From Swiss-Prot:
InterPro entries: SAICAR_synt/ADE2_N (IPR028923), SAICAR_synthase_Vibrio-typ (IPR014106), SAICAR_synthetase_CS (IPR018236). It catalyses: 5-amino-1-(5-phospho-D-ribosyl)imidazole-4-carboxylate + L-aspartate + ATP = (2S)-2-[5-amino-1-(5-phospho-beta-D-ribosyl)imidazole-4-carboxamido]succinate + ADP + phosphate + 2 H(+). The gene is purC. Its EC number is 6.3.2.6. GO terms for cellular component: cytoplasm. This is Phosphoribosylaminoimidazole-succinocarboxamide synthase. HAMAP family: SAICAR_synth (MF_00137). It comes from Shewanella baltica (strain OS185). One of its GO terms (biological process) is 'de novo' IMP biosynthetic process. It is an enzyme of class 6 (ligase).
Length: 367
């Protein structure tokens, strides 16, 4: 089979039994199981959740998005070989480490295949929980233009690009478009302060005011666990985005959990430690792909200017990126995953067929 065949680009057409529309995100697709199948799996697989918990099959793809667009390569390559399996493997590793360190649970109940999670339904917090240890990216661009207050936090004068910040900063933004919140524009991905969240905690999805402290603790503790583990393999954990939600446990109590992915090259910046000590930035995350795109196209403003979104979408749709650029991203993702987990990343020749086979034979979920 060709390299293109090994890439799972379309992940919303699997014949999984469901009575709800498939939810397709930029990278993952979610298939909500029927009530009968959810109850059957909870019983037969022994998942530690209430018997009426809705379950979903979450299938990751190898697609790559940047600047809110999906990009593709030469030779019919619609994604990055190994990317999906690498992202899941990294998240699985960090969630396991979180559990070992006594942090919160995640939404994942089972991992049938490197591309697949079985997850429990959660009530999401409508906050992108962003943590920054270094000043770079959008924060540096704003700081260099004179901004000093970020999400209600005042930064000192004299900071330099890419330097370590005096303390770990929490700089949240809105998740989705939220309306009716004083002082918060009804736009996706708007920076907010802790005081914004406190004053409107229920609108942001928090069940109790004190859970804001818990979310910040889980964010900082999770960051520190990953940062320490990455330092052990000479990688620098620069910044990251976590997501949180509530689930109901077997005793009927709400508990805050980690959701989505954590500490991956998609959701984080990761730098090579040796290069950083040498005064250079070597990206081991999607940031390297973003920088490639900014250098590859003659007018990078198309990628940065939100007012030029139609042009940007056409740019992504109409241009096949060089194969070597796509494979460099593949090497970055699989390389980080193998360093983090200490194990090779499986690259199945036909992942879709493998997923269908496992979900049919071991879970009886294929129609």
């Amino acid at each position: 089979m060709s390299l293109a065949d090994s890439v799972l680009a379309i992940n919303n057409d699997l014949p999984i039994r469901t009575d709800s529309p498939v939810h397709s995100g930029k990278v993952r697709s979610v298939y909500w199981l029927t009530d009968a199948d959810s109850r059957r799996l909870i019983t037969t697989k022994g998942y530690n959740v209430p018997e009426d918990t809705p379950l979903a099959i979450m299938v990751i793809s190898d697609r790559i998005s940047a600047f809110d667009c999906i990009f593709h390569g030469e030779g019919g390559l619609k994604g990055i070989p190994g990317k999906g399996a690498a992202l899941n493997a990294i998240s699985n590793h960090w969630f396991k480490l979180f559990a070992e360190n006594g942090l919160a649970d995640s939404h994942i109940l089972d991992i049938p295949h490197p591309f697949v999670w079985i997850v429990q339904k959660a009530r999401p917090i409508k906050v992108e929980a962003i943590c920054r240890q270094y000043i770079t990216g959008s924060m540096w661009r704003a700081y260099s233009k004179g901004e000093r207050v970020f999400c209600g936090i005042t930064l000192p004068e004299g900071l330099e690009k890419d330097q370590k910040l005096p303390e770990l900063l929490i700089t949240p933004s809105t998740k989705g478009i939220l309306t009716g919140i004083p002082g918060v524009p009804a736009q996706d991905d708007v920076n907010i302060s802790r005081s914004d969240i406190e004053a409107n905690y229920q609108a942001f999805g928090f069940e109790k005011l004190e859970d804001i402290d818990l979310y910040e603790k889980l964010l900082k503790d999770g960051f520190k666990v990953i940062s320490k583990a990455l330092a052990d393999i000479d990688q620098v954990f620069v910044d990251t985005k976590f997501e949180f939600g509530y689930v109901t446990d077997k005793d009927g109590n709400s508990k805050l959990i980690y959701m989505d992915e954590v500490g991956t090259p998609d959701s984080s910046r990761i730098w090579d430690g040796a290069a950083y000590r040498d005064g250079k930035i070597l990206e081991n995350s999607k940031e390297g792909f973003r920088q490639f795109l900014l250098n590859h196209f003659p007018d990078p403003d198309v990628l940065l200017n939100k007012d030029r979104m139609p042009e940007r979408e056409a740019l992504a749709r109409d241009n096949d990126l060089p194969l070597e650029a796509m494979m460099q991203v593949s090497r970055t993702y699989t390389g980080v995953a193998e360093k983090v987990t200490g194990a090779p990343i499986p690259l199945p020749a036909n992942p879709k067929a493998d997923i269908i086979k496992i979900l049919r034979e071991e879970y009886d979920l294929i129609v």
